[in-house]
Every structure is written in C-alpha cells, then in structure tokens.
Amino acid sequence: MARQPAKVEEMDAWVIRYVNKLKNMMGLSNWTIMMQAKPSSADALGETEVIHGQHLAKMYLHKDFRKDSPEDIRATIVHELLHCHLAVLEEAVHEVLKPDPDDAKSKAVHKMVISLIEYENERIIDSLAESMGKWMPVPDMPKVRVKKKAVKKVVKKQVRSKK
C-alpha cells in the first residue's frame, strides 16, 4: 500500500496579513516572512528561523494559536519579528569565534558563548516585545462561530379532568 503524502495546511490569510502589517511597522518591510503551517516546538509559542543575509525568515506558531487572545498573538508575533533584527548578533559571534575543529577547548568555549548570547538575546527580545508590543495593533481575528443546537420543544397539553 502506497503511503499518502502528509497534508500540508496553509497558514490562515488573516495571520499573513497581520504579520505583514507588523513587519512593515517594525522596520522589516524589505524582509520576506514565510509563515509556516507546521507548528512550532511543543514548548514554544512561536519560533523563527532567520537567514539574515537574505532578509528571509520562517515563522512557526504553536498548534493552538487560534485559541489565543488577540493580545497574546500580538505579543508572540512581535517577539518573533524582533528575532529578525537581532539574529545578526548570534551569527556574528558564531563567525568570529568559529572554533578550530581539532581543538576541544575552543569548541567548548564557542558552545558556551553561543549559548550565553542566545539566552541574553531572548531576554532582550522579551523585554523589547513587552515594551513595544502594547503600541502595536492587535490582529483582526475571525469571529468564533457558535454552533447553535436545534432545540426540540415539547408542548404538553394540559388535560383538565371534568368533575
């Protein structure tokens, strides 16, 4: 039996519009942000892979992002877009401290410094996202449709007894 290819869903149009709006407001108008339908890691609200030299980023949101409040979605997307601005720091440090492949000590130092830079970058991005996010618009999310259940009304006739 032939395996069926996995069905790849497209990202919601309202999310793409919102990300494009925010990227322009955040000085990233010359960037291409590719919204990925595949969810981010289970322990993350979002993830972004940045290719700085190409002004390209792939953004992933967690699988249940549609259940988030507009404010939470705004916070996540502002945070992820800030990675586009700051990823160059990690890339520069990585290149400057590129370890000698035969030197275990330089590999260990490289790994430690990169981990420190990544950690501090996340803290900086968290702080910037929190302070500037409140000035950004919230997304125009589709209204949640409530399914109404058909209610069957039973009318009971009152029977009066004759006395």
Where are these regions (language model features)?
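Metalloprotease/metallohydrolase-associated module, dominated by Zn2+-dependent proteases
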Residues: A2-E71, V88-K163
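Active-site recognition of the HExxH zinc-binding catalytic motif
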Residues: A75-A87
